[in-house]
Amino acid sequence: MLDFMDYIQLAFAEGTNWNRDNSYSSLTATAQSLLDFSTPERLRVHLSSLSTPNFATSYTLGTVGLIDGSVSYLYSTVPFTNTPSRSALIPLRKLSPGYRQVTPPSAPIEDWNLDSILDNPQNVQPSFASKPTLLHATLHLPPPTTLNALFLRRISPTMHLTLAVCSTRGPPLSKSAPQASLLTQLSHDTGKYSNEYLFSTDNALFGWRGLWNFGPDPRSATDTAAPRLSLLSAGAEAYYSPVSSLIGMSTGLRFSTLPAATDVPASTATGSATANQSTPISTFPYTLTLTLTPLTGSLSTTYSLRASPNLAFSSRFGFNVYSWESEMVAGCELWRKSRKQDDGLEWARRKMRASEPLSLPSLPAESTERQEEEEATDSVLKIRVDQSWNVRVLWEGRVKELLVSAGVGLGPSSFSSSSWAAAAAGSGQSSGGGVPSYWRGVGVSVLYSS
């Protein structure tokens, strides 16, 4: 489950119309959400609040061997007036990433008044307030204290600047300066393609990521153009560090159906619709990815599909051409939808929908109905298993005013010293290997926000 601050950052991206799917770093985001989710460690409590439309705070207390915690603050020039902040009102699908429908690429919005300094230099607010900006800082306690800071800024309709700082305080008796690193990322998204330029002070690492979308350019699209049914994207990334002589690169492909492929097309104005026009192009959304890392010889393919609004599956197969090692992972998620109270008027609604003219558009109603179904879900169950029978089970749901996340990890490769000691004492053995224990760990995370 995402933290409250991550949820606010996603709301900032949506509020500034930034398409996070049009990035090479999000090429396998759907498969990672279904296969690489993490389970909570021990007990952790999150208390968060959106005290003003522009300011949020969050406090975390956890017990992972030792008691630890963190304090977070966030400020944004974009007000979150319409963003649900109470834990009882936040849609669970916003906090629990699962199968995500890829957003179609769109042309950047040009009406930001970014050139107001040249047009009317006398009536101009400070540039800090004219462009969407977000500041976020988290202090992790107890010592060694770690400070994480984040700076986000939309410098233009197509440019996005990110500065991330991580500083760790040394031991109490150490006189050395705190270890710190800075990561700078400049993103450029035109809808047709996107580029990301990265630099990290850690080993002076330089990086580049790019993504290209096949098909028409959204900047030259017209209002009468038919919606796209699918999207094919190709991307690559490269890294180089002159200090450590580190070189890395990868490339990948992604094919995904778009929302228009699973929607039932609207009927013609004359009311005569053929059989092909009354059925969707695809019965369910799906996403295919292929990634290749030439230097290490790693090849990975994923296939994710949403069989129903409340059920999704995903699988991944990896192979290394140098070591001949392979990996196979499968996972699924099952959403539980809360039952709506029956007011006895459903028969009237069905009769009214049946009597509507065929020429009325159906897409807005379908999108509204789909959104209502997603907001009505109150729990999700995720299961993941690999070829070594390592199993992770995660349940996330709403309990009264709280958002609860509980998970357990099972696997044959872990060993328990206590179980080995008990077995050795009972059998009289003084040496030997440990008894395998399938119990890897269990944890519960509780989130409350106001």
UniProtKB/Swiss-Prot annotation:
Pfam families: MDM10. GO terms for biological process: establishment of mitochondrion localization; mitochondrial genome maintenance; mitochondrial outer membrane translocase complex assembly; mitochondrion-endoplasmic reticulum membrane tethering; phospholipid transport; protein insertion into mitochondrial outer membrane. This is Mitochondrial distribution and morphology protein 10. Its main location: mitochondrion. It is found in: Mitochondrion outer membrane. InterPro entries: Mdm10. The gene is mdmB. The keyword Protein biosynthesis does not apply. Lacks alpha-helical transmembrane segments, suggesting that it resides in the membrane via beta-sheet conformations similar to those predicted for other outer membrane proteins and porin. Keywords: Membrane, Mitochondrion, Mitochondrion outer membrane, Transmembrane, Transmembrane beta strand. PANTHER family: MITOCHONDRIAL DISTRIBUTION AND MORPHOLOGY PROTEIN 10 (PTHR28035:SF1). Component of the ERMES/MDM complex, which serves as a molecular tether to connect the endoplasmic reticulum and mitochondria. Components of this complex are involved in the control of mitochondrial shape and protein biogenesis and may function in phospholipid exchange. mdm10 is involved in the late assembly steps of the general translocase of the mitochondrial outer membrane (TOM complex). Functions in the tom40-specific route of the assembly of outer membrane beta-barrel proteins, including the association of tom40 with the receptor tom22 and small TOM proteins. The keyword Mitochondrion applies. It is a multi-pass membrane protein. Belongs to the MDM10 family. One of its GO terms (cellular component) is ERMES complex. Component of the ER-mitochondria encounter structure (ERMES) or MDM complex, composed of mmm1, mdm10, mdm12 and mdm34. Associates with the mitochondrial outer membrane sorting assembly machinery SAM(core) complex.
